[in-house]
Each structure stands twice: as structure tokens, then as C-alpha cells.
């Protein structure tokens, strides 16, 4: 049996691509070979693909000298499969090329299975790697899982302001401005009152300028161009900026941290990055909590605009009624399409691991005949490849937050927001079996 991932199947949803890579890494790491029968080849962008072809020719020649006949044949098979995959490409794809080929052992330790993966990563891997051994090498793939959310920083004090972004480990200074604000006037009299008024006016104008530049730096096409915004400084300016109505209202919801720093400018930026690290890490969990909390709110208000459980969610999706699918990233539901060998009709089943072991789900209830399995897919993977066909979006949920844990344990780890109300009893009728049933008396926390 040959498994493959078509090269270049890169979608427009970064989080889905990251989820696919995470699943692929887990699969590859669980593969065990019989001897040195597994080849890992990663070619970075702009690398001459013919160079890798020549390398494989040399490796194939060297493999002929392996003394053990079984090992020799396994290595030759793996390298030959890799060569065949490489021939599919005239040049290295834009983001590089990843190929994994080999013969692996199944769980019984005896049965062998042929594995062939070739794909263009959804973003570049700038590292060449060739390895032939008893396991697949996945370290370069883990670089694809690095978070690339972009965060904005405003460092503001009485001397000036700095605007910057942080993306992964890369930071960029967008703009710097300086200001000379008059110091406080210590003497009394009318002049001190006038001076204080002028000073306050200059401070106000400076704050207005800082707010205006925040909008020009962090808003593009009428929406924020960063995931979160950090305000930092060593005086009251940062707090005033967050509270003033001069700051664009579209930026207020994405302020994730306000921190005190000892310096202005780039030194202040370095300090702000360190002090806001926890807040930036929590951004994803905050977004998840908001999404799932909204889901729970719709349930409590009985709006009829959400769906949960595998059967209801998949039926609503089939009807085109689901706008956003909420999906537990480790959902253990398998989608089967089975066919009656006599009547020719098909059914779709959604089974959890326990149900998959029960033969009753694969028999015709009337005749007792065994049904033919037409297809078998992990439901999460099937959704990731097909969600766009139903004009839906997919949002992954973890069980790391309290809300996420409740969604997974209480609602089966799958649900969705609807475009319009659906009478699920009428829509479902006689549907496939399986999945996790939901009991509102015992499951809702």
C-alpha cells in the first residue's frame, strides 16, 4: 500500500497547514523500519534539484554493496522510490521539497508497508537534509510549526516614540519620532499657570501624534495588521494612550499588554519584548476562550444558531449551513463510507475508536451481510481537505483552556456556528451511526 501527499497542496489557512504538518510529523515519527530502509530528503528553495538526483544515484550505487540481501533490497527500494518521486519535479518548488519514502513495520512487527510522501511545505524550509536509516528524520519539519503571528509594539515616553513589530524571533523597527516637551515649571505666579497650560497642550498634541502614527503603522485595509499590540514606556504616556479616545478604536481590542520599561527606544523595545512574553503566549488561548465562550453563550440563549456533536455538525455542513467549524485538534473520530454489496447503496458512518472495533456497524442490519468499506479517513483530516467545498471555515480547539476542555469533554470536540437555523431532527432523518452522543444533563458543565 502506498500513501502520498500530493505536492503543493497548500491551502489559504495557515493554522490548518500547521495542523496537517503536526499530524504528519506524528505519523512519520511513529514509523519504524526494518533496518536502514527509510529515506528522508528535504531540498531547500532555489537548490538545484538535479544535485539531489545525482546524490541519489550515488547512494543507489553504494547500496549495491550492502552484504545483507534483505537490508540491501529494502534500501534500494526506498532510494528508488525517492528517485521516482524526484522525477515528478523539473525544478525545486518555491518553498522547497520534502520526500519521505521507505518500508515500515506494522504493529505486529511482521507485516511491512510501503510509505511514500512528497509535498511542498506551506512555507520555506531553508535546510538541506538527506538521511537513510531506521526512522524518518522530522526535525526540519518542526520549523514549520514556529508561530508566525505578528505583534505590534509602541514604546512611548517623554523623549519620543518607537513603533516596531515582532514575528517569531524577527523584529522590525517601523518608525521613530522624537519630542522635546517642556519640563515642569517650579516657580509660582501667572507665568507658571500659563507655562503649565502650554506644557499640557504640547503633551496633548504629542499624544495625539503618537495615536495617529499607531493607526498608520498598525492598520491596513481598515483592519489591524498585527495579532496583538503591546504598549510600553517609563512614564504615564502608555496608560494615557490606552485610555484616550484619540487611539483608533480598532486597535483597542488587540492591546494584549501594557508594561513599564526603564528605557525608551530600542533598549525599551528589548525590555518590552521580554516583559510581555507571557502575554504574547496567551494570545492564542485568549482567542480560543472567546470563541468557545461565544459558542456556550449561543447555547445558553437557545438562539438555534449553533450545532454540536458529530452527526448534527456533519449534517449541517452537508446542507451548507455551517459558517465556522469548531474542531478539537486531536479528535478521534473516523469517517467511513460503506456500501451494500447487493443493493449498491452507500452510507456514511462517524465512529469513535470503540465503535470501530464493533462489527455491527459494518453489517447490513436487515440481511446481516458485511458491508464493503469504500473509504476510511480521520474526520479531522477529511474536514481539512474538504471544508472549502462547503464554504466553511475551520477553527481548531485545544483542551488546554477550561473552555476548550469543556467543549471537548461535553460536546464531543466538534461543533459549529450556523449561517441560518436548521431543524436538525427533520434534517437528520435516518442517518449513519456512530460518534459521541451528547447528554445535556450529564455533559454540560
Swiss-Prot record:
Q: Which SMART domains match?
A: eRF1_1
Q: Which UniProt keywords apply?
A: Cytoplasm, Protein biosynthesis
The protein's location, in the record's own words, is:
Cytoplasm
Q: Which residues cross the membrane?
A: none
GO CC, sorted alphabetically, is: cytoplasm
A Pfam family of this chain: eRF1_1
* Single Gene Ontology MF annotation: translation release factor activity
Q: Give a yes or no for keyword Cytoplasm in this entry.
A: yes
Q: Which family does it belong to?
A: Belongs to the eukaryotic release factor 1 family.
Q: Supply the PANTHER family for this chain.
A: PEPTIDE CHAIN RELEASE FACTOR SUBUNIT 1
Assembly, in brief, is:
Heterodimer of two subunits, one of which binds GTP.
Function, as annotated, reads: Directs the termination of nascent peptide synthesis (translation) in response to the termination codon UGA. In Stylonchia UAA and UAG codes for glutamine.
Name it.
Eukaryotic peptide chain release factor subunit 1
- The primary gene name is ERF1
Amino acid at each position: 500500500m502506498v500513501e502520498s501527499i500530493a505536492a503543493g497542496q497548500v491551502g489559504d489557512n495557515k493554522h490548518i497547514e500547521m495542523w496537517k504538518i503536526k499530524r504528519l510529523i506524528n505519523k512519520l515519527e511513529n514509523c519504524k523500519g526494518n533496518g536502514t530502509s527509510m529515506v528522508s530528503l528535504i531540498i531547500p528553495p532555489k537548490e538545484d534539484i538535479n544535485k539531489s538526483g545525482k546524490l541519489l544515484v550515488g547512494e543507489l550505487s553504494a547500496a549495491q554493496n550492502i552484504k545483507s540481501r534483505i537490508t540491501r533490497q529494502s534500501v534500494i527500494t526506498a532510494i528508488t522510490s525517492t528517485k521516482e518521486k524526484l522525477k515528478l519535479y523539473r525544478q525545486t518548488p518555491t518553498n522547497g521539497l520534502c520526500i519521505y519514502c521507505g518500508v515500515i513495520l506494522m504493529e505486529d512487527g511482521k507485516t511491512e508497508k510501503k510509505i511514500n510522501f512528497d509535498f511542498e511545505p506551506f512555507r520555506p524550509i531553508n535546510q538541506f537534509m538527506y538521511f537513510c536509516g531506521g526512522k524518518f528524520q522530522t526535525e526540519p519539519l518542526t520549523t514549520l510549526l514556529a508561530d508566525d503571528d505578528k505583534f505590534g509594539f509602541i514604546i512611548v515616553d517623554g523623549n519620543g516614540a518607537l513603533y516596531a513589530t515582532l514575528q517569531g524571533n524577527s523584529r522590525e523597527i517601523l518608525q521613530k519620532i522624537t519630542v522635546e516637551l517642556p519640563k515642569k515649571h517650579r516657580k509660582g505666579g501667572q507665568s507658571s499657570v500659563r507655562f503649565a497650560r502650554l506644557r499640557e497642550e504640547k503633551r496633548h498634541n504629542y499624544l495625539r501624534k503618537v495615536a495617529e502614527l499607531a493607526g498608520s503603522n498598525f492598520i491596513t485595509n481598515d483592519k489591524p495588521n498585527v495579532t496583538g499590540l503591546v504598549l510600553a514606556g517609563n512614564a504615564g504616556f502608555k496608560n494615557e494612550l490606552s485610555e484616550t479616545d484619540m487611539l483608533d478604536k480598532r486597535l483597542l481590542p488587540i492591546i494584549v499588554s501594557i508594561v513599564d520599561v526603564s528605557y525608551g527606544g530600542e533598549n525599551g523595545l528589548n525590555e518590552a519584548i521580554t516583559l510581555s512574553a507571557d502575554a504574547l503566549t496567551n494570545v492564542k488561548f485568549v482567542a480560543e476562550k472567546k470563541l468557545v465562550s461565544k459558542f456556550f453563550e449561543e447555547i445558553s440563549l437557545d438562539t438555534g444558531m449553533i450545532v454540536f456533536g458529530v452527526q448534527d455538525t456533519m449534517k449541517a455542513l452537508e446542507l451548507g449551513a455551517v459558517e465556522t467549524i469548531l474542531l478539537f485538534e486531536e479528535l478521534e473520530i473516523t469517517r467511513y463510507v460503506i456500501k451494500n454489496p447487493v443493493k449498491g447503496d452507500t452510507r456514511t458512518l462517524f465512529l469513535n475508536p470503540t465503535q470501530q472495533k464493533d462489527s455491527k456497524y459494518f453489517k447490513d442490519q436487515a440481511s446481516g451481510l458485511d458491508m464493503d468499506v469504500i473509504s476510511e479517513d480521520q474526520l479531522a483530516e477529511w474536514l481539512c481537505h474538504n471544508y472549502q467545498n462547503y464554504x466553511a471555515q475551520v477553527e481548531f480547539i485545544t483542551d488546554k483552556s477550561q473552555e476548550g476542555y469543556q467543549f471537548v469533554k461535553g460536546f464531543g470536540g466538534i461543533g459549529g456556528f450556523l449561517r441560518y437555523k436548521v431543524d436538525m431532527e427533520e434534517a437528520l432523518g435516518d442517518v449513519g451511526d456512530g460518534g459521541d452522543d451528547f447528554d445535556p444533563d450529564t455533559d454540560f458543565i
